Amino acid sequence: MLELYEKRRALLLLRLAAMFLSLAALLITVLNREDGFFSINVFGSPQPILTKATADFTLVKGLKFFAGAMGIVAGYSFLQLAIAMASMFSGAPSILGGKRMAWLCFVGDMTASHLCAAAAAVSAQLAYLGKRGAPMWSAVCTYFSHYCLVFGLAVIFAFLATLAALLVASISSYHLFRLHGILQQQQQQRRQLQQEHVQDKP
């Protein structure tokens, strides 16, 4: 009983961590913005023209994907937390339910963890390009240093959320295959009992 309680608590804490970390990454990305000024050399003009620009997540498709993915992971984690709490209060023997629920959790957790990992990888690549630049992409962090610094926090939260989501997916897969083995063992026991019952008949 104590072991079951510890497993439930660990899974709940991991889901809670994934939810808050992905939500933090989402909010930081969406709310982060900075106004910057940079000069443009125009042919024929004696002096460069000073131009104002605003950096936010809507300027790059990768940032939109990152924000959307973090929102999906946070929403999914909240849904699973609600289901888990309902399962605990109802006195269900397992936080992941029966075979069908275990399959749904397994597929959902694997999808969420891979989506979170993909979003974290995209954010890391964008952070690198913003800092170092590329042949066709200037180092925008030169002009928007505060924006890049704050976005770095979102990248850290995204990777921590990925770690929590992967641990949740590992627990879900372990439970699913363990449940599958238990069900197979129960079926074999029923068959043996049926065979013994048939043999005992005169």
From Swiss-Prot:
It is a multi-pass membrane protein. The chain crosses the membrane at residues 11-31, 65-85, 102-122, 149-169. Residues 32-64, 123-148 are extracellular. Pfam families: CASP_dom. Residues 1-10, 86-101, 170-202 are cytoplasmic. The keyword Cell membrane applies. One of its GO terms (cellular component) is plasma membrane. It is found in: Cell membrane. InterPro entries: CASP/CASPL, CASP_dom. Keywords: Cell membrane, Membrane, Transmembrane, Transmembrane helix. The keyword Metal-binding does not apply. PANTHER family: CASP-LIKE PROTEIN 2C1-RELATED (PTHR33573:SF30), CASP-LIKE PROTEIN 4A4 (PTHR33573). Belongs to the Casparian strip membrane proteins (CASP) family. Homodimer and heterodimers. This is CASP-like protein 2U7. It comes from Selaginella moellendorffii (Spikemoss).
